[in-house]
Amino acid sequence: ENEAGTKATGSLVTSFDNIEIDSKIKDRFTLIKDENNHVIGNCQINIYLWYSSYFGDSLTACRLSIYELNKRLNEEEAYYTNINPEDYYKQSDLLGTKAYTAVDLSVSDSIRKLDTYVPSVSIRLDQAKAKKLGQKLFKADRKDFYKAFPDLFSGIYVKSDYGDGTVLYISQVQMDVVSIEYVTDSITGIKLKSKVNAEKDSIQYTGRTFNSTREIIQANRLANDTEAIQKCIDNSDWTYLKSPAGIFTQVTLPVRQIAEKLEGDTLNAVKLGIPIYNETSDKKFGMSMPRNVLLIRKKYKESFFENNQLSDGVTSSLFTQTSSTTNLTEYTYNNITKLINDCLKAVSYTHLT
């Protein structure tokens, strides 16, 4: 993940020295001081990886590490799954590690079954890391804080470094910066007393939340067993669909033969069917058959994804399984006439793709 989209949920303004609270709570917050050793705030920083679902074994022990990026990703550049994360972080920039399972058994069944429950993997930055980032945040100009945030914090790299057989489908990454402050009168600024203990000032939690959104770059690194992939590619009896990284499956359409047979006639309908072979793997957890398959002309494959285009029936055609398709044995593109006609326009060229 790189620079985050942001949403304000409070403010980071407080004096922490003399706040009298439970020591267990106070220990979770880091004092932030300026260059003159004066306290300018306090904070607790948590990072959450929310996921909508998962694949594989729900109880496989896994671990991830989160690193701070040392430079921003270029918003004008397209990043592919062969991106090298080491170009953007150092081992010393570790923010934290977390062991987890896809199903968190520390959460009660009654909570996990709620419609509002969303599972997550979270880490809390230690005192040293929270202090380093907190100093940047508290010294920032409050008026342009959100604009300045990407320059203060370039983003994170999440690395899976232990366990296999489980994939989390991350839907959102969130960083919460929480602090404790006195509750004051909005007009006079005088500290308000606690309703529980009138001898103590009232305190509250406040903070800001920074979310990853679709508008910012979320680049994924995928690596494959090259020898195993090559064996699949070398198979002459069938091919595999393995995307977005793995096997670049190509289909050749007889456009020249179609053009020769037409001889000026109009092409009304073209149907393409690609047979599906049954999976014979005996693995306990196997990925389900793809329900959506994109057929795209080779010449457009880079621009299609880099420009975030949608299937238009001309440069590409999308197969989507419907509820009426009970037994999926073939990917059927019922009408790719527009795509073929677009190819026919270039039939005079020496090579078609």
Language-model region placement:
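Aromatic- and glycine-enriched pocket-lining scaffold segments that form the walls
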Residues: 112-185
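Coil residues (strongly favoring Ser/Thr
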Residues: 58, 109-110, 186, 202, ...
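Beta-strand-rich interaction/scaffold domains
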Residues: 56-131, 284-332
